[in-house]
């Protein structure tokens, strides 16, 4: 007896050491402290006790520590460190309970008494007394609080006794490893599953509750003293755990895990009930409720105290006949967090509760049972008419017995009261077609329906042509609105007016009676969201010429007179919403989807009609290219031109252009917003003034977008040709050409500018011309362009004579880095017609080829960019050809010399010789 008490005190000391240093000392320091204070045999005993206690939890990895308990190490110090490390590890694993339940576990420090005293006080231990009645015991019973999250309780009517007679307790400092709480009838391995809802959700007022105690083995003499013998269950532990009175047997780890292969899922759930404080008259001498119920056999020896006041284990919330409960209660959390809500199971939906969430209101309201609001359960429908005072969660408190209220009242508040749902967020449009008429089942609902209809009438000015689905979505939360049914046919009115096929928009009555399941509702919801956008309002898809969304005040359907007529008729009949028959309400979602499809088809046809204006683009482009070729030919013609541009002729042409082409898109050169006038076709916006447009692009635009006008392409381009022909031939004036043509074309497009703007524009254009007209003496010398391009284009020879294989004379190697060196040797170039005539001495040499050379200086031409390409293969080919030419030349000279010599010999020598003879 003394040895047992000392052993218990020793284990108390070790566990208190672990408890006090767990959160303040590191793992290594805790192991060192255990090794320094205790012997190997004591540590081995504690490890075996902790191991067998931890094996009560089926989640405990027993095989990891079984090999360690069998291992034999010769060095005692190493073995001691290993045992201490195992103790700390098992202790931490027991508390963590898989890592997920640590925050939910009660942080109580219970005392475990030895078995000899437990049977003496088995009856009296179950009686609950207040702490003030009991005198403190001498064995640290009053020194340590029983709970950090619970009200302080003592387990029995305390008897005045000395410490020698006092039963010894082992404190389970964070003692959740001692609690095998999950009690199944068929000796299921004890689990810590039920503990996760105890501590953080304690009821505010102290509630005496039933004490179930799990025995903690303390017979140290009967334990094996060696570390190697500690794995098998000794006789003392067997006597401790196995008792004929109790149906609990400690099994091996393999047997514990084999229970999962059996039919343990159908075991009945034993749920200890709460004992209310109104039973205080019975508490001193009565038995708890669980002992009165004979169909609940006890599972544990009544020697370790474990208070239950878990809402989850309350039979009100956990009915015994429910055999479909999830194996792990965390599945309820998973179901409650899914988007479309939990799945109804056999009508027990209002008794399903998330574990550990009983004393909290659910932070998110319950998700909709289905997107089809016809299938709302009855208990949720009862929330529509409840008062806010009835919506408080009622839990047992110190002054009342646990009420067995019904399922709908027992549920948390899932929905906001309907009076608060009339005010919607600003970004969400009111959809006057929400709830079906069969759900408007009470006068209160009808009054709210009328109020919402009035609210809809006030906001009719912002009504769009498309309404959303039955729920307005805020995040993933679906809120239900009692809204106006008579608008159910308003959606497909425009489609019916367009196509005239009213029967295609409806289904038969047989199809309407079929209730849609969750999957079809999900897809219908996704279709509506994809068509309508997240707010359920179809954006107007009328795009202007720049591709941006035009700011129209009406949607596509509102602009049609048919839609206005249907809207008026529907508005007249909106007061008869309660008389709207049921098939129309059932057809509502299908008609809404079909009307959206009809709108989409109409929009596609609209776009196709707009695209028809591009059918003749190819022919017009060919005509434009022909005109541009004529322009090039006119530029190449030699003629005397003036340097200054005759702007008066240009201004005289501008009004005629404007009057002749009323459909041209006009915009100020500095304006920012494009304006659509009376052009039915696509019009390209020139809002920025088109300062970067080239001449050809402008001509192309003008030929494309003035096609419906009365002017022909020839008349249209004649002004452009005359303007281009009146420009100086100077390469520096090419910028003037593009600039003036750009400004003149913009001038034709300016109609709203007025005479003041026109004068200002003329002044600016003249200043720009003067800016480009620089005297020759102030111009910087540039690299001259020889006849390379002219010869390359017009020469019949494949290799022009100006192409030489030498680096300095070949224009292929003309580089910007070589320009400075080339200018020193080549002298002053001629950049104007006068300089060219003076330098060449012949004014008749100004030909179309010269203008073509200057054409190559125009950056708008492809030759300007293709001229200076470096081609080393071409250079080697040139050198080879030049060598062949030189060789042929030498051969010809040699042949001529030989022929001359032969001729001299034959003509002179032979007659002389003949004459001498």
Curated annotation (Swiss-Prot):
The keyword Transmembrane helix applies. Keywords: Angiogenesis, Cell membrane, Membrane, Phosphoprotein, Transmembrane, Transmembrane helix. Belongs to the MINAR family. GO terms for biological process: angiogenesis; negative regulation of angiogenesis; negative regulation of cell growth; negative regulation of cell population proliferation; negative regulation of neuron projection development; negative regulation of protein ubiquitination; negative regulation of TOR signaling. Signal peptide: none annotated. It comes from Mus musculus (Mouse). GO terms for cellular component: plasma membrane. Interacts with NOTCH2; this interaction increases MINAR1 stability. Interacts (via N-terminus) with DEPTOR (via PDZ domain); this interaction may stabilize DEPTOR protein by impairing its ubiquitination. The keyword Nucleus does not apply. This is Major intrinsically disordered Notch2-binding receptor 1. Residues 1-892 are cytoplasmic.
């Amino acid at each position: 007896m003394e040895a047992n008490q000392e052993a218990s005190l020793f284990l108390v000391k070790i566990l208190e050491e672990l408890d006090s240093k767990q959160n303040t000392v590191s793992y290594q320091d805790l192991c060192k402290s255990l090794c320094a204070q205790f012997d190997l045999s004591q540590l081995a005993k504690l490890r075996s006790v902790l191991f067998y206690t931890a094996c009560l939890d089926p989640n405990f990895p027993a095989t990891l520590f079984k090999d360690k308990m069998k291992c034999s190490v010769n060095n005692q110090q190493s073995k001691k460190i290993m045992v201490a490390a195992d103790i700390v590890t098992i202790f931490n694993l027991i508390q963590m309970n898989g890592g997920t339940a640590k925050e939910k576990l009660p942080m109580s420090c219970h005392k475990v008494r030895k078995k000899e005293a437990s049977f003496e006080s088995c009856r009296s231990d179950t009686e609950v007394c207040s702490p003030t009645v009991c005198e403190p015991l001498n064995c640290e019973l009053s020194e340590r609080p029983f709970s950090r999250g619970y009200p302080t309780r003592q387990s029995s009517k305390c008897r005045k006794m000395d410490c020698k007679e006092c039963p010894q307790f082992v404190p389970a400092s964070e003692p959740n490893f001692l609690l095998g709480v999950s009690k199944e009838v068929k000796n299921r391995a004890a689990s810590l599953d039920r503990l996760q809802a105890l501590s953080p959700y304690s009821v505010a007022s102290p509630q005496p509750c039933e004490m179930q105690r799990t025995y903690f083995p303390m017979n140290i003499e009967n334990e094996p003293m060696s570390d190697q013998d500690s794995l098998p269950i000794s006789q003392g532990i067997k006597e401790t755990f196995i008792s004929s009175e109790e149906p609990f047997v400690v099994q091996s780890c393999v047997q514990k895990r084999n229970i999962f292969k059996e039919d343990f899922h159908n075991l009945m759930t034993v749920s200890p009930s709460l004992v209310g404080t109104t039973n205080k008259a019975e508490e001193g001498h009565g038995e708890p409720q669980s002992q009165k119920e004979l169909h609940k056999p006890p599972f544990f020896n009544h020697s370790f105290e474990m208070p239950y006041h878990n809402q989850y284990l309350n039979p009100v919330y956990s009915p015994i006949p429910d055999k479909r409960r999830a194996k792990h209660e965390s599945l309820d959390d998973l179901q409650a967090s899914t988007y479309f809500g939990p799945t109804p199971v056999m009508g027990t939906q209002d008794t399903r509760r998330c574990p550990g969430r009983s004393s909290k209101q659910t932070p998110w309201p319950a998700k909709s049972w289905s997107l089809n609001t016809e299938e709302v359960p009855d208990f949720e429908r009862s929330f529509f008419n409840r008062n806010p005072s009835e919506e408080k969660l009622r839990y047992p408190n110190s002054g009342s017995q646990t009420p067995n209220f019904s399922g709908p009242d027992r549920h948390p508040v899932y929905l906001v009261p309907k009076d608060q749902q009339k005010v919607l967020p600003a970004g969400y449009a009111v959809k006057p077609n929400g709830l079906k008429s069969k759900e408007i089942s009470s006068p209160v609902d009808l009054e709210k329906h009328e109020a919402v209809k009035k609210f809809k009438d006030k906001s009719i000015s912002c009504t769009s042509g498309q309404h959303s689905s039955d729920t307005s979505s805020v995040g993933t939360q679906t809120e239900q609105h009692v809204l106006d049914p008579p608008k159910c046919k308003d959606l497909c009115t425009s489609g019916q007016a367009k196509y005239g096929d009213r029967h295609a928009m409806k289904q038969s009555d047989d199809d309407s009676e079929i209730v849609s399941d969750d999957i079809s509702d999900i897809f219908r919801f996704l279709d509506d969201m994809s068509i309508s956008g997240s707010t359920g309002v179809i954006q107007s898809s009328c795009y202007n010429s720049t591709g941006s969304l035009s700011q129209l005040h009406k949607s596509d359907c509102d602009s049609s007179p048919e839609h206005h007529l249907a809207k008026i008729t529907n508005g007249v009949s909106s007061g008869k919403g309660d008389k709207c028959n049921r098939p129309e309400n059932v057809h509502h979602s299908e008609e809404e989807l079909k009307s959206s499809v009809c709108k989409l088809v109409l929009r596609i046809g609209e776009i196709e009609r707009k695209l028809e204006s591009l059918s003749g683009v190819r022919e017009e482009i060919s005509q434009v290219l022909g005109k541009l070729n004529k322009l090039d030919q006119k530029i190449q013609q030699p003629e005397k031109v003036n340097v200054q541009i005759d702007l008066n002729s240009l201004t005289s042409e501008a009004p005629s252009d404007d009057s002749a082409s009323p459909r041209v898109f006009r915009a100020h050169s500095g304006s920012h917003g494009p304006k659509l006038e009376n052009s039915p076709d696509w019009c390209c916006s020139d809002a920025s003034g088109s300062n970067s447009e080239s001449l050809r692009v402008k001509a192309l635009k003008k030929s494309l977008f003035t096609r419906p006008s009365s002017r022909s392409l020839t008349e249209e381009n004649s002004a452009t040709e005359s303007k281009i022909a009146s420009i100086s031939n100077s390469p520096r004036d090419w910028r003037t050409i593009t600039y003036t043509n750009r400004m003149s074309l913009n001038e034709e497009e300016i109609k709203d500018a007025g005479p003041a703007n026109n004068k200002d524009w003329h002044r600016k254009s003249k200043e720009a011309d003067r800016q480009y007209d620089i005297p020759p003496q102030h111009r910087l010398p540039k690299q001259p362009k020889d006849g390379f391009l002219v010869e390359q284009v017009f020469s019949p020879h494949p290799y022009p004579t100006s192409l030489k294989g030498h680096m300095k004379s070949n224009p292929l190697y003309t580089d910007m880095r070589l320009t400075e060196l080339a200018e020193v040797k080549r002298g002053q170039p001629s950049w104007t017609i006068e300089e060219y005539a003076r330098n060449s001495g012949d004014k008749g040499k100004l030909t179309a080829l010269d203008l073509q050379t200057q054409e190559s200086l125009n950056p708008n031409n492809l030759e300007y960019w293709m001229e200076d390409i470096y081609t080393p293969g071409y250079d080697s080919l040139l050198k080879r050809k030049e060598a062949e030419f030189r060789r042929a030349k030498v051969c010809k000279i040699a042949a001529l010399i030989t022929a001359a010599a032969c001729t001299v010999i034959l003509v002179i020598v032979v007659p002389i010789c003949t004459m001498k003879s």
